């Protein structure tokens, strides 16, 4: 998708393909009304007010055949998502009818939109910045209401405003430093300039570091916690997974080794998406299929954000249990004592502190797991502070980290007594890095790559 491409008129189906009550075909560009007028039978579109919905029919003018009865939305530039003229044809849902209407539009002068091209035009026409464009995709992909809240705030411009204000402050600082350098005849100008640079650099660094502190929570809410359920065979791992999911998604039997692979499912725990990984029981085995599952389990354990270690409280600790306790001790771990509905035989004093006794069979204390997750990852402070700006995008986090590094370089240079005019280079670099976040200084290749990840019609 070229950045310099002429803005011709584009079209795409904006609703998921398949049967449904309504399908929407979207057109955007200078010729949107002209093309729609060729195939729409109803009111004269050139005389219709903007932002209205109009009843009529879509007709193939070559055959004089009606394709569908529709409601046609007219939205005139610049007060549209793309800041171009936009037509949205609301058809009866279905693969055949929406495709027929799209093909008719393409035959009469529109081009098939590329993935994300409507949002890309909104960006290139100044309707949204890059953070807001990315928030559109985050909103589409949000798995929980908390992830949706963060995406909506970003779409509303919270991160954009913070970054733009910081960039303006950096420019103001650089301009003041430049003025001071240009008038060296004042005796105290060098000291004033150094003091200004130090104060502002520390202020910017503190702001960026505070933003980075939100990254862990934001990334968890956006992408979820990779959660490995581990334990020796037949301690209730798959039953726990099913209990959390409230569905029978994993095989549950009384035969050891029946979970021979890694089973992944998502579950919403108080607004946090947990990617639950039910692993094969980790033990020595000669079964080649089970052996592969065990190796994958060990890999899942290494990569997990959270480990749920399940032990059988109705049996004494085994060597395998002790091995798993040792293997997972450096992880964010919650130890669960399952089968509390049976007589207890495990020695609790041999276990780490803060274990949670549960009975998957009787659904006992499952809610305590949710509370412990909140304690570990959110310091019991709640999931989302509504007035906070969160970093959740890996690209944004990486760029903020680079900006902090540039600011640290300025501070280190000041401590070493380097000339302020040399340190302006690092301060300017910070300004440029922050511009990559909003798209003001992002390379064309990055913009093209970002929008290529969007779905068709968006």
UniProtKB/Swiss-Prot annotation:
It is an enzyme of class 3 (hydrolase). GTP binds at residues 234-239, 253-259, 278-281. Binds 1 potassium ion per subunit. InterPro entries: G_TrmE (IPR031168), GTP-bd (IPR006073), GTP-bd_TrmE_N (IPR018948), GTPase_MnmE (IPR004520), MnmE_dom2 (IPR027368), MnmE_helical (IPR025867), P-loop_NTPase (IPR027417), Small_GTP-bd (IPR005225). GO terms for biological process: tRNA methylation; tRNA wobble uridine modification. Keywords: Cytoplasm, GTP-binding, Hydrolase, Magnesium, Metal-binding, Nucleotide-binding, Potassium, tRNA processing. Its cofactor is K(+). Its EC number is 3.6.-.-. GO terms for cellular component: cytosol. K(+) binds at residues 234, 253, 255, 258. GO terms for molecular function: GTP binding; GTPase activity; metal ion binding. The keyword GTP-binding applies. Its main location: cytoplasm. The keyword Transport does not apply. (6S)-5-formyl-5,6,7,8-tetrahydrofolate binds at residues 26, 88, 127, 458. Residues 224-378 form the TrmE-type G domain. It is found in: Cytoplasm. Pfam families: MMR_HSR1, MnmE_helical, TrmE_N. Belongs to the TRAFAC class TrmE-Era-EngA-EngB-Septin-like GTPase superfamily. TrmE GTPase family. Exhibits a very high intrinsic GTPase hydrolysis rate. Involved in the addition of a carboxymethylaminomethyl (cmnm) group at the wobble position (U34) of certain tRNAs, forming tRNA-cmnm(5)s(2)U34. Homodimer. Heterotetramer of two MnmE and two MnmG subunits. This is tRNA modification GTPase MnmE.
């Amino acid at each position: 998708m070229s950045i310099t491409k002429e803005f011709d008129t584009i079209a795409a189906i904006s609703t998921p393909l398949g049967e449904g009550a309504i399908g929407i075909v979207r057109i955007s560009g200078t010729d949107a009304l002209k093309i729609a007028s060729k195939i729409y039978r109803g009111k004269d579109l050139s005389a219709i007010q903007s932002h209205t919905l109009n009843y009529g029919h879509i007709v193939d003018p070559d055959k004089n055949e009606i394709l569908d009865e529709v409601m046609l939305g007219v939205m005139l530039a610049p007060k549209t998502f793309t800041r171009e003229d936009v037509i949205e044809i609301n058809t009866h849902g279905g693969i055949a009818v929406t495709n027929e209407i799209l093909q008719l539009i393409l035959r009469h002068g529109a081009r098939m939109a590329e993935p994300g091209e409507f949002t890309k035009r909104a960006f290139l026409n100044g309707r949204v910045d890059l953070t807001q464009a990315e928030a559109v995709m985050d909103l589409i992909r949000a798995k929980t209401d908390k992830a949706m809240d963060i995406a909506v705030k970003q779409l509303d411009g919270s991160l954009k405003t913070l970054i733009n204000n910081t960039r303006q402050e950096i420019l103001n600082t650089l301009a003041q430093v430049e003025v001071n350098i240009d008038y060296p005849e004042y005796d105290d100008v060098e000291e004033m300039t150094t003091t200004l640079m130090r104060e502002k650099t520390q202020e910017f660094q503190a702001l960026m570091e505070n933003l980075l502190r939100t990254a862990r929570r934001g990334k968890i809410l956006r992408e979820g916690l990779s959660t490995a359920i581990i334990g020796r065979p037949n301690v209730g791992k798959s039953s726990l997974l099913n209990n959390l999911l409230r569905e029978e998604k994993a095989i549950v039997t009384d035969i050891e080794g029946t979970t021979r692979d890694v089973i992944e499912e998502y579950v919403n725990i108080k607004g946090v998406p947990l990617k639950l990984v039910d692993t094969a029981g980790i033990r020595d085995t000669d079964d080649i299929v089970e052996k592969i599952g065990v190796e994958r389990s060990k890999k899942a354990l290494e990569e997990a954000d959270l480990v749920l270690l399940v032990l059988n409280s109705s049996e004494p600790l085994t060597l395998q249990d002790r091995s798993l306790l040792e293997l997972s001790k450096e992880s964010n771990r919650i130890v669960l004592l399952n089968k509390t509905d049976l007589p207890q035989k495990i020695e609790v004093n041999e276990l780490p502190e803060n274990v949670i006794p549960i009975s998957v069979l009787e659904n006992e204390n499952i809610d305590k797991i949710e509370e412990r997750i909140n304690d570990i990852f959110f310091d019991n402070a709640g999931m989302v502070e509504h007035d906070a700006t969160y970093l959740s995008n890996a690209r944004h986090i990486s760029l903020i980290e680079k900006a902090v590094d540039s600011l640290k370089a300025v501070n280190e240079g000041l401590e070493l007594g380097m000339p302020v005019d040399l340190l302006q280079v690092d301060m300017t670099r910070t300004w440029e890095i922050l511009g990559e976040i909003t798209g003001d200084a992002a390379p064309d290749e990055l913009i093209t790559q970002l929008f290529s990840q969007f779905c068709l019609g968006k």
